[in-house]
């Protein structure tokens, strides 16, 4: 079987459900099998995966840092839906400036994107898997 190109869509919050962790495990498995993970699009409550203000207990898995490391090692785009993120208080530096906010909290390695980016991924990747 030839290698496929994937985009994942993560709707589950960083620690509120199992879906984000399952998406991460799926991502690492498909890379190990030789497939390419092009991007992960965080939508709805999934945008909370992109806040740098998440501080899990010392004995818990740090999912945000895991996504960052995966992205850096395998050149994966981490995109949070800008509209969903703003509604949930996940704000990039440029959005903070645009909306007159004094602070921003989008974690390094994540970017904010519109639904057009997800639509493009659906048209160009071999597989789009939603969690």
Curated annotation (Swiss-Prot):
Which organism is the protein's source?
A: Vibrio vulnificus (strain YJ016)
Q: Where in the cell is it found?
A: Cytoplasm
Give me the Gene Ontology terms describing cellular component.
sulfurtransferase complex
Task: Please tell me whether the keyword Cytoplasm is annotated for this protein.
Answer: yes
Protein EC: 2.8.1.-
Q: Name one GO biological process term.
A: tRNA wobble position uridine thiolation
What is this protein's name? Sulfurtransferase TusD homolog
According to the UniProt entry, its GO molecular function terms are:
sulfur carrier activity; sulfurtransferase activity
Q: Which Pfam families match?
A: DsrE
Key word Transferase present in the record?
Answer: yes
EC top class, in one word?
Answer: transferase
- What family does this belong to? Belongs to the DsrE/TusD family.
Which UniProt keywords are present, listed alphabetically? Cytoplasm, Transferase
